[in-house]
Design a protein with these regions (language model features):
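Bacterial N-terminal signal peptides that target proteins for export
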Residues: 1-11
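N-terminal signal peptide c-region/cleavage motif recognized by signal peptidases
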Residues: 19-21
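Flexible, solvent-exposed loop/hinge segments and secondary-structure transition points
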Residues: 25-168
Length: 168
């Protein structure tokens, strides 16, 4: 008895009309932040802090915590890049601004600060469009996390119309 190679089995199944149900979990469709918007958010955040006299870094991560853009202003300490990224990652993990998370979950702050890539500090702000979480922006380098967060929010305000209409 001769066995059919796998390709022939598939051809026979296809021609016979056998179908396989597709589950919603088989294919994912998601909204995520594009490079151009990420770049412009980071730029606006750095410029907002610069207007206030602060040299900062801004990092935009996508909804999975992957870095899309990282900018360090002239004069910003090199460590601000890592801190900004960790703030953005914390925001993505919690799906709330890092400052709000810090206030509401001080009980687990020490443990989270030991997880590589996360830090529980003010300065991470979520990026939302049409109800979708697109990612987060983290800012570091101003004297105090609340000032970092203000620069991130100013960037999002400056690009609000573009962000709101990003999801069609």
């Amino acid at each position: 008895m001769k066995l059919f190679p796998p390709a022939r089995h598939l051809a026979v199944l296809a021609l016979s009309g056998v179908t396989f149900p597709v589950s919603a979990a088989d294919v994912l469709s998601e909204r995520n932040i594009g490079m151009e918007l990420a770049r412009d958010i980071a730029t606006e955040a750095v410029l907002a802090c610069r207007q206030d006299g602060y040299q900062v870094s801004a990092v935009v991560v996508d909804r999975h915590g992957l870095t899309r853009v990282a900018l360090r202003d002239d004069g910003a300490a090199r460590f601000t890049l890592e801190i900004a990224e960790r703030k953005a990652n914390m925001t993505v993990m919690a799906w709330t601004d890092s400052g709000q998370f810090r206030q509401s979950r001080a009980d687990i702050r020490p443990e989270l600060n030991h997880i590589d890539g996360l830090i529980v500090m003010d300065g991470g702000v979520k990026i939302l469009s049409g109800g979708y979480n697109l990612g987060a922006v983290g800012v570091s380098g101003a004297p105090g996390g609340e000032k970092d967060a203000a620069c991130a929010r100013k960037a999002l305000e400056n690009l609000n119309e573009r962000i709101e209409f990003a999801i069609e």
